[in-house]
Amino acid sequence: MGRIFLDHIGGTRLFSCANCDAILTNRSELISTRFTGATGRAFLFNKVVNLQYSEVQDRVMLTGRHMVRDVSCKNCNSKLGWIYEFATEDSQRYKEGRVILERALVRESEGFEEHVPSDNS
């Protein structure tokens, strides 16, 4: 097997895989904390890196029927949640392309402040 190359999304509050600590996303990508997964509380994120995706599955959830893919850590293969590919209800379309990470399967930690110089400095 070859090397695994991981992305780092940066940010002051980071979410990482609870099993291997691979960085997944940051707090600025967080959309909602009001979701529930198989292990309990779950968070909806706009952008998440370092994931592997399963085949598309048709699931009936509390909010209706969705086409989803399970997501797992690219580094250690631990299951982390799912990504919404398609929602049949118009009111649920905002979830499409967004990722659910189950709170019990990720760890939140301090990141770092990035100073990006402006053109004026």
UniProtKB/Swiss-Prot annotation:
Zn(2+) binds at residues 17, 20, 73, 76. InterPro entries: Yippee (IPR034751), Yippee/Mis18/Cereblon (IPR004910), Yippee_fam (IPR039058). Its main location: nucleus. It is found in: Nucleus; Cytoplasm, Cytoskeleton, Microtubule organizing center, Centrosome; Cytoplasm, Cytoskeleton, Spindle pole; Midbody. The modification Phosphoserine is found at residue 118. It holds the Pfam family Yippee-Mis18. Residues 13-110 form the Yippee domain. GO terms for biological process: cell population proliferation. It comes from the Eukaryota. Keywords: Cytoplasm, Cytoskeleton, Metal-binding, Nucleus, Phosphoprotein, Zinc. GO terms for molecular function: metal ion binding. Identified in the CTLH complex that contains GID4, RANBP9 and/or RANBP10, MKLN1, MAEA, RMND5A (or alternatively its paralog RMND5B), GID8, ARMC8, WDR26 and YPEL5. Within this complex, MAEA, RMND5A (or alternatively its paralog RMND5B), GID8, WDR26, and RANBP9 and/or RANBP10 form the catalytic core, while GID4, MKLN1, ARMC8 and YPEL5 have ancillary roles. Interacts with RANBP9 and RANBP10. Component of the CTLH E3 ubiquitin-protein ligase complex that selectively accepts ubiquitin from UBE2H and mediates ubiquitination and subsequent proteasomal degradation of the transcription factor HBP1. Required for normal cell proliferation. Belongs to the yippee family. This is Protein yippee-like 5. It comes from Macaca fascicularis. The lineage of its organism: Eukaryota, Metazoa, Chordata, Craniata, Vertebrata. The gene is YPEL5.
